[in-house]
Every structure is written in C-alpha cells, then in structure tokens.
Amino acid sequence: MMEQKKKVNLQDLLDLQNELLKDNSFHVSQNALVKNSLDSVAINYQNITKYNEEYSNNIKQTSAKITDQKNSGRCWIFAALNMIRDKFIVDNNIENFEFSQSYLHFYDKLEKANVFLNQMIDMVDVDTTDRVLFSLLSDPVSDGGFFEWAQNLILKYGVVPKSEMEDSFSSANTYTLNKLIDIKLKQALVEIRLNKTSKSAMFDIKEKYLFEIYKILLSTYGTPPKKFNLSLKDKKTSKVKKFYNLTPHTFLKKIKFDFNDYVTVAYTPYKKIKLFQRYELDYANVMQEKGNLIFSTVDKQTFKLLALAMLYKNKSLWFACDVDHFYNGKKGVWANDLYDYEKFFNIKFDNNLSQHIEYRHVATNHAMTLQGFDFDEKEWEKNQKEYFSKVKNRKLSVNDLKDLVDLFPIKKWNVENSWGEKRGNKGFFVISQEWFESYVYEVVVSKKTIVEFLKNPDFLSKKDYAKFKNFATNQSKADAFYNELLGNTFKTKPIKLPIWSPFNKKLKG
C-alpha cells in the first residue's frame, strides 16, 4: 500500500508533456487558454443568446432602482427588504423607494456579538479544539445570514427609509470592521475564561465588551434613527402624503407585510435529508431570545410549484442558491450549458447533487428575489392535452398536480439581484430552469398565498382543475392540497442538524 503512495515523478510528467505536445489540438487550446480567461474560451455562444430578458410572466411592475450591497455580504437583508419594498411601492403608487439595509445590519452585528458572548460563557470549560467551539470561533460576526434572521431583526427593530440611514463606508465595505469586532470578541473571551469561577464577573465582562462593540458600530454606521418624517409622492396624481414622527415600528405597521406568514422551504437531493420534514440548524440563531433556524423540506415538484404560486400571485420570492457555477457576469446569466469545460479538461458535470452537497462542491451562498419566468405555451398545451387524456377515467389527486408541475415547461427565470446596475442587465439576471434545479435550494413563501393559489392554480383552467377529487365539506380542495403539499410537514418534529452541516452555511454572496 505504501509503495502506491509515491511522490510526484518528474519523469512521468515529462513523458506526458511530450505526448501532449505532439497533439495539434492541444497546441490550439493551450495558446487560447494562456492568453485568455477559461470562461471566455469555453463559452458556448450559441446557447447564451437564448437567455434574453423576455418573459411570459413578469411581476416586476415598479420602476424601483436596483440596490447595491457593494463590498459586503448583506445579500440576505437586501433580498428580504426588496421583497417588502415591491409591495410598498405598489401600495403607495410611488416611483422609487429603498429601505435602509445598514439599519438592520447595525443591529445584526450587535445581536451576533451578544449571542457569541453568551455562547462563550456557556462553553467556558470547553477545550478550544472542540469541533463546535472551533466552528463558533471561526465565524462570530461575519456579514452572512438567513431569511429568518432578517425576519427577526425587522420584527424586533422595525425598518427605516434609506434616506434616514444611508450606507456608511464601513457598512458597504465590511472587511476591516468585521476583523476589529472579531478581535474585541476574542479579547472578551480571554477575560471570560480568566474569570470563569464567577458567573457575575463573566457577565460583567460580556456587558463591557458588548457596549464597546456598540460604540464601534455607532462610530462606523452612524446613529440609528428613533423618529423621522416621510413624504411619499403619488407618481400619477403628484399628490404628496406626509407622515410625521414615525418610529421604525410605526413605519413597519404602515407597510402591512405579514412576516409571520412567511416560511423557508428547501429542496435538497442530499441522501441524508428526508423530504417533507422540518429541520433545525444548531447554533443558527441571531438573537438570544429566538431559537435556532428551522426550515422544511419538500420534493422537487412541490418546490417548483411553490415558486410558481408566489409569482402567479404577484409576490416577489426570496430564494437562496449557489452562484459559483456556470455564471456569465457580462450577460447576467446562470445556465448549465453556458460553458463547454468538458472539451478542454474532460471534467464531467454529472447530476449527482447528493454527492455534490456531501463533498461541499455546492452550498447556498447568495440570496436574491425571483421576479418572473418564461415558459413555452405551445409545449404546455401539448403536455396538458396528453396528460389529461391519459388520466381521463379517474379522479385526480395532489400527485397529479405535482406531475403537471413537472411538465410545466419553464425555460428561464427573472432575478432581481443586489449587485448594482452595472452588472447583468441593469441589475437583473437570468437563470435557466436546469440551473434552477441544480443550484437553487431554498425559497421563502407565504402560507396564505399558497392556499390562495391552490383554490385554482393559475396554470390550469377551472375546467381541468375540477377534475381533481373533492374533499369533505369541512375541508376545501385548496386546504387539503396545501396540507398534503406543505401543511403536514410543518407538524413534524424538527430534526437537529449540527453546526458543521452543509446547510448551516450563512449567505453572504
């Protein structure tokens, strides 16, 4: 066995090199790749042209400017606030509006520091080589997060207009700030461990350092507003509505966005994860008073149906994905068929997503919002006709609905990003359906909206939906289907996943 573990043999390499240099095609590819980027040489121009900005269904009805997270990992906050601003702009018929991302991120840093210090007190006797403690020490206050964290921050601290708390240099360029807060937290940890025999002394140290971090945040982000005035100009009538002495919470009430109705749903083909089951991410909490993050899993068809339901009902859809694959920034496209790496390097991109997740080839790292999709109407008419002909002699069930969703021929999706207007198509991006199935793993949906959609799914006619079986009078078809697709999953006892799970990775793209 040891003989097989030999060192790199220079002669073997020279022999291989000599063989390659005899191959004219290798010379051609080498000359091209040495002087150009891999992506520019491997790009498939025939495929990239089909990913244009034309969509059969697009809900983006506002003229709101694209947001820009700049050199920070605040994507999860930007995507959450972009969801609610779409509703706010439509409800108030205004030209543009933006919520302050820095306001929420200010308190995100403070809450993370508080949670970390409490964890360090709880683990004061744990050896620093412990796997959990090692993970916590590696990433105490980075920019990343999840939808639920944004949800909790908004409900606790409210929201303010961006005009009341603009991006500071440090909120838009967080690297140095994060390092400084990290140093403070590690200094606190040293003092806590030196005083571990006294519980009160440890908490006094915690409070001292938390106030010091609060001072750093005030110095670098600015002071969060407590009260403010707001004027909203109707873009049609030019009438101006004025609001005085708003607080972040009274302003939140005026938005009328039911955050408690929204839940995170995941589709993951990872073999160690059950479908239609709730999961809890250990140590994934941004506030001491909140528990760990919980998400629910569904199958691929249900996942697609939920995304369609939100968009058909004109609701922006927060989603999380892995943006590190098959991306063309100039065109603003993510698609599996953009590049032909296989011809150059014999790298086969198989569809064994379970292995990709297990071996950390893929993991969610960025959040954006879906704003629309494009499907082939003629192909859909054909698929429906064939399917209903095949099942005409029986009442249809929720499984038939999922089969039809599978047959619904989406070609591409419209995405609103938070990377500014200079990237993509003025800040908007395209993702192919194949890429969606490969790299989109989480969506955030409104339970009420899903039930509303299931009263008569928009992609089916009322006549065809009537073919689905009816239920007892005390339960509507919509409610019954909702429970089968999603509701029953919410009743399952959460299974806890460790901090080193592939799913316990913060979004900071």
Walk through the language-model features, giving the residues of each:
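Conserved catalytic-core surface of thiol
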Residues: Q371, D376, K382-F388, K392-G509
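N-terminal regions that are enriched for targeting/export leaders
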Residues: Q4-A64
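Active-site nucleophile-adjacent alpha helix/oxyanion-hole segment immediately C-terminal to the catalytic cysteine
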Residues: K50-W318, D376, W413, R423-N425, ...
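Intrinsically disordered, low-complexity acidic Ser/Thr-rich regulatory segments
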Residues: D282-V286, N352-Y359, D400-P409
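Bimodal feature
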Residues: K5-V28, K65-T67, F78-L81, F88, ...
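Long, positively charged binding patches that form subdomain-scale interaction surfaces
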Residues: N292-N365, W380
